[in-house]
């Protein structure tokens, strides 16, 4: 009889491999499976990562196939096509939706009790696709959403104020994409509202918000320009979500979940535990933020309506 937690990752690319390493290093799982169409690639990644076994808690790791997903507590999907020159965003979405049509039924077949965590981009749209294809309750299909974006926001504010990022409490909400935005009115520095902190330290709040918002939006583009992809921070973000689920922490994370209309996935602060989504904690927003959130959700709904499911 299996003891401990089992986490499976589908996709052995830069992100999937980094997530595999992060989960192994965390000690959260006793069993880890990495699945990829290129079995040799998955085997190579598992060999490389597992050779660090002497430095971490005992964990069984293997490169497997879909049947090896059996008894997984969480299945993380990172697989997907990259956007090609001249290819539209909708073309890419339909291509990845087609890939999900081959993946998700296999996940449900072999791991029907698992939480599905989607990381592939565009994550909100593909989380909705996974939800529809799986037939699972919405609470058991999550997207990584804006957990990483929110970490970037906290990093930027912490660097600005020379503080520990763990004491900055702020969330990016909406789409994981161009229509996302910081929920500034709910941001806290320690236990102080950001606006009060700025007033006390003679900081121009409007200027700060504009500058930091731009900086956070551009982080991923700058990284991609320099190294071609992002993989480490998203791996840590996913590890944090996995931790909240496996340890039943009821943590508040800005994962992507189904909205109340049932027509789109988007990110707001959400309580996450062993059953996935427990509830959304939508903070009170000012009029401008409420409008931005509505517009972001509309962008996602319109995109989803065009998908070939």
Predicted regions and their residues:
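Conserved N-terminal Rossmann-fold NAD(P) cofactor-binding segment
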Residues: 31, 35-72, 87, 305
């Amino acid at each position: 009889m299996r003891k401990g937690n089992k986490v499976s990752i589908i996709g052995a690319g830069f992100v999937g491999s980094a997530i595999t390493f992060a989960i192994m290093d965390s000690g959260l799982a006793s069993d880890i499976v990495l699945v990829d169409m290129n079995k040799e690639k998955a085997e190579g990644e598992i060999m490389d990562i597992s050779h660090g076994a002497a430095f971490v808690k005992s964990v069984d790791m293997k490169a497997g196939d879909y049947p090896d997903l059996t008894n997984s507590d969480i299945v993380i999907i990172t697989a997907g096509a990259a956007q090609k020159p001249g290819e539209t965003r909708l073309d890419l979405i339909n291509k990845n939706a087609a890939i999900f049509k081959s993946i998700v039924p296999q996940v449900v077949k072999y791991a029907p009790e698992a939480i599905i965590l989607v990381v592939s981009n565009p994550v909100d749209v593909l989380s909705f696709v996974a939800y529809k294809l799986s037939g699972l309750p919405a609470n058991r299909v999550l997207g990584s959403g804006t957990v990483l974006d929110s970490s970037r926001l906290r990093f930027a504010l912490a660097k600005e104020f020379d503080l520990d990022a763990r004491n900055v409490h702020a969330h990016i909400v909406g789409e994981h994409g161009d229509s996302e935005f910081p929920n500034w009115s709910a941001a806290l520095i320690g236990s102080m509202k950001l606006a009060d902190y700025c007033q006390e330290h003679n900081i121009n709040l409007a200027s700060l918000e504009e500058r930091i918002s731009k900086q956070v939006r551009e982080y991923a583009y700058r990284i991609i320009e320099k190294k071609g992809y992002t993989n480490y921070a998203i791996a840590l973000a996913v590890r944090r979500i996995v931790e909240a689920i496996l340890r039943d922490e009821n943590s508040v994370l800005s994962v992507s979940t189904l909205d109340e209309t049932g027509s789109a996935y988007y990110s707001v602060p959400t309580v996450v535990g062993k059953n996935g989504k427990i509830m959304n904690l939508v903070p009170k927003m000012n009029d401008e933020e409420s409008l931005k959130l509505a517009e972001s959700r509309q962008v996602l709904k319109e995109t989803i309506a065009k998908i070939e499911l």
